């Protein structure tokens, strides 16, 4: 069963949020969706946190004709992993994004114009502090769980370290305590693609720049896949529409990247892409602490980690570093290494590989 037709909601907070940079952002609008019913003692809420280019549209459809359901539709609904007969599931769009929450494409109330590059640099920690405002608004004192993959996993880490008394458990998939130099360098090249697109106009564009963002998305998309998955899907096949010795002829993998890159341009704001890339690069769960050990000393909730064998963006050793530290500190932690050919995106594509473990973990968290 599915959650059916859903509605996006939003709330605007007139209070200012002091950011990690020291700058002030306000008012703040947060777009969110909820699924299921909050129980009488408000103890069954699960916050699902999205990745880089995700949104609050976690599951269901806005109308019958909507082509695709929410981005993790397979795990949310009656009888599914996040059973809406049991849990009240929340997903909000992070600040800095472009799907309803305040970001660089939003109107600055002080100027009446889009923020563009006057928008302050935000961090993952800032995103989570904004989410805490939403949870307060919903009247929830303590979340049953926070669950997310990739940048969503970073948000779950921040909930565990910054709001340790407000979560009962955390499920973290395909993430890292801090992006590596390689991960940062790939985002840097993606930024160059945008900066060198003349239609970007230093962020003051009227129409979303196409070529720079499409190329940047193509670079990012490669990091989400793996050699195994790309070989299986495309191999070295040449596009049937092109002659092999046509200078501009494309391999199937080229055509795929081209299609997905330009399709992305139609749904995502370029400046938001840049701001969230910066937030990813800046991320360090130990920011503000002397060490990872000191950061994880704050953790109180049981934590469950998943890494995927072919993920080369945030490879398993990065997850294992966190697990070792939590074990050293005597914190309750589970770790599962999933054998997968789908690379970083495995957490989105192979939910059946982790569903049984997460279901049991969530039940224990509520025991």
Curated annotation (Swiss-Prot):
Acyltransferase found in the keyword field: yes
Main location: cytoplasm
Keyword Repeat: no
Active site positions: 150, 311, 344
SUPFAM superfamilies assigned: alpha/beta-Hydrolases (SSF53474)
Positions with a binding annotation for substrate: 217, 345
InterPro entries named in the record: AB_hydrolase_1, AB_hydrolase_fold, HAT_MetX-like
GO MF entry, a single one: homoserine O-acetyltransferase activity
Pathway given in the UniProt record: Amino-acid biosynthesis; L-methionine biosynthesis via de novo pathway; O-acetyl-L-homoserine from L-homoserine: step 1/1
Keyword list, A-Z: Acyltransferase, Amino-acid biosynthesis, Cytoplasm, Methionine biosynthesis, Transferase
One of the GO biological process terms: methionine biosynthetic process
Residues annotated as domain AB hydrolase-1: 44-350
HAMAP family: MetX_acyltransf (MF_00296)
Family: Belongs to the AB hydrolase superfamily. MetX family.
Role, per record: Transfers an acetyl group from acetyl-CoA to L-homoserine, forming acetyl-L-homoserine.
Name recorded for this polypeptide: Homoserine O-acetyltransferase
Gene that this polypeptide is encoded by: metXA
């Amino acid at each position: 069963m599915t959650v059916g037709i859903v509605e996006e909601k939003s709330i605007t907070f007139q209070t200012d949020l002091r950011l990690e940079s020291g700058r002030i952002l306000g008012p703040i609008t947060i777009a969110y969706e909820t699924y299921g019913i909050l129980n009488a003692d408000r103890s069954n809420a699960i916050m699902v946190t999205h990745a880089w280019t995700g949104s609050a549209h976690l599951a269901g459809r806005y109308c019958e004709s909507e082509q695709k359901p929410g981005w993790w539709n397979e795990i949310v609904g009656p009888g599914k992993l996040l059973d809406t007969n049991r849990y009240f599931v929340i997903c909000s769009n992070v600040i800095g994004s472009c799907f309803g929450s305040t970001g660089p494409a939003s109107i600055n109330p002080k100027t009446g114009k889009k923020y563009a590059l006057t928008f302050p640099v935000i961090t993952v920690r800032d995103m989570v502090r904004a989410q805490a405002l939403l949870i307060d608004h919903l009247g929830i004192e303590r979340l049953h769980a926070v669950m997310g993959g990739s940048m969503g996993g970073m948000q779950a880490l921040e909930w565990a370290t910054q709001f340790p008394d407000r979560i009962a458990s955390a499920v973290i998939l395909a993430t890292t305590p801090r992006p590596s130099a390689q991960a940062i360098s790939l985002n840097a090249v993606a930024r160059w693609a945008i900066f060198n697109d003349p239609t970007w106009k230093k962020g003051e564009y009227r129409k979303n720049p196409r070529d720079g963002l499409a190329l940047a998305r193509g670079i990012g998309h490669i990091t989400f896949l793996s050699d195994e998955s790309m070989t299986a899907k495309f191999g070295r096949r040449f596009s049937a529409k092109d002659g092999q010795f046509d200078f501009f002829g494309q391999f199937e993998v080229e055509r795929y990247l081209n299609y997905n890159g330009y399709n992305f341009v139609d749904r995502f704001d370029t400046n938001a892409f840049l701001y969230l890339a910066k937030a990813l690069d800046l991320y360090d769960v130990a920011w503000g602490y002397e060490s990872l050990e000191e950061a994880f000393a704050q953790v109180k909730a049981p934590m469950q980690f998943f890494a995927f064998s072919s993920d080369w963006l945030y490879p398993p050793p990065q997850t294992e570093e966190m697990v070792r530290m939590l074990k050293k500190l005597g914190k309750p932690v589970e770790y599962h290494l999933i054998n997968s050919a789908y690379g970083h995106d495995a957490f989105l594509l192979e939910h059946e590989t982790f569903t049984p473990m997460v279901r049991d973990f969530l039940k224990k968290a509520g025991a």
